[in-house]
């Protein structure tokens, strides 16, 4: 948090310094044309400076929006005034006051983020449980002892994959509200992985079908990404996957040559 916070302040400083008239308008600015760009800058140094300021300004604006989600709304006029005063060497705060204020603000952001994460985690856990219970009542749906809820759409043929096997799948992953977070179909490329190298819900679930099979997995958070979550997947999310098992590649058998060499050595001693 601390390193990010410093980058955020730098973004504000640079954005305002390089482009003083910057405003935080609600509406997006009209895209510049090639003619506008050529007329605005006398040389590459000016253009590069502006590009840096625009990039940092956008980053800072996004950072402020994220803080607003935590209930923290900074006064943008004061933010800009602070930067301008610093460049004019007319700061209204001493270095010590600045340091103390920023430390307190950092603690506030961290506390608010933790509180939001815990609230989101509790809400997602409750909604996920309700979703799983409802899905479990549908025809052909089973619930395992671990809490995995699944529906075999097509069983497939051959042997079911083992932990050490490599599987090739196509899949679509969504949250319980239908929001898609991953899709191999749209990427145009199936995913290949060792079965025991993914989230537990997948490792367990894919053993219920064979090559050519299809399955719907509704995975509780404890078999997915848990309370921590990952980018794109909030904490304590129940995940919904539609998976097609395209191929199963058995793990290579251990090389029998060392054993054969040992037997040959024993024979030679006799």
Curated annotation (Swiss-Prot):
Q: Name one GO cellular component term.
A: outer membrane-bounded periplasmic space
One Gene Ontology molecular-function label:
protein folding chaperone
Task: Using the record's annotation, list all stretches that form the PPIase FKBP-type domain.
Answer: 164-249
Q: What keywords are annotated for this sequence in UniProt?
A: Isomerase, Periplasm, Rotamase, Signal
Pfam families found in the cross-reference section: FKBP_C (PF00254), FKBP_N (PF01346)
What GO terms in the biological process aspect are recorded for it? protein refolding
Q: Per its UniProt entry, which superkingdom is the organism in?
A: Bacteria
Signal peptide boundaries: 1-25
- Report the top EC class in one word: isomerase
Q: Which reaction does it catalyse?
A: [protein]-peptidylproline (omega=180) = [protein]-peptidylproline (omega=0)
E.C. code: 5.2.1.8
* Main location per the UniProt record: periplasm
State the InterPro entries in the record: PPIase_dom_sf, PPIase_FKBP_dom, PPIase_FKBP_N, PPIase_FKBP_N_sf
Keyword Mitochondrion carried by entry:
no
Q: Where in the cell is it found?
A: Periplasm
Q: Which PANTHER family match?
A: 39 KDA FK506-BINDING NUCLEAR PROTEIN, FKBP-TYPE PEPTIDYL-PROLYL CIS-TRANS ISOMERASE FKPA
| Record family assignment | Belongs to the FKBP-type PPIase family.
What is the role of the protein in this entry? Answer: PPIases accelerate the folding of proteins. It catalyzes the cis-trans isomerization of proline imidic peptide bonds in oligopeptides.
Query: By what name is this protein known?
Result: FKBP-type peptidyl-prolyl cis-trans isomerase FkpA
Gene symbol here is fkpA
């Amino acid at each position: 948090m601390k390193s990010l916070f410093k980058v955020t302040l730098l973004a504000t400083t640079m954005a305002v310094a390089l482009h003083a008239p910057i405003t935080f308008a609600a509406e997006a600015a009209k895209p510049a044309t090639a003619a506008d760009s050529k007329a605005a800058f006398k040389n590459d140094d000016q253009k590069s400076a502006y590009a840096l300021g625009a990039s940092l300004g956008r980053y800072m604006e996004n950072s402020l929006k994220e803080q607003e989600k935590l209930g923290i709304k900074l006064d943008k006029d004061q933010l800009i005034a602070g930067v301008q005063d610093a460049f004019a060497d007319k700061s209204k705060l001493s270095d010590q006051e600045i340091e103390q204020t920023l430390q307190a603000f950092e603690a506030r952001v961290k506390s608010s983020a933790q509180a939001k994460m815990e609230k989101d985690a509790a809400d997602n856990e409750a909604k996920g449980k309700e979703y799983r219970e409802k899905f479990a009542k549908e025809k052909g749906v089973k619930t395992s002892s671990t809490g995995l809820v699944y529906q075999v759409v097509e069983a497939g043929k051959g042997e079911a994959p083992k932990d050490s096997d490599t599987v090739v799948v196509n899949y679509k992953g969504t949250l319980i509200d239908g929001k898609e977070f991953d899709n191999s179909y749209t990427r145009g490329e199936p995913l290949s992985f060792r079965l025991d190298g993914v989230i537990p819900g997948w490792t367990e679930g894919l053993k219920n079908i064979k090559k050519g099979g299809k399955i719907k997995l509704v995975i509780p958070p404890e078999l997915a990404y848990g309370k921590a979550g990952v980018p794109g997947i909030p904490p304590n999310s129940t995940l919904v996957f539609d998976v097609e098992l395209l191929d199963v590649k058995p793990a290579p058998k251990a090389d029998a040559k060392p054993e054969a060499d040992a037997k040959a050595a024993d024979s030679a001693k006799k």
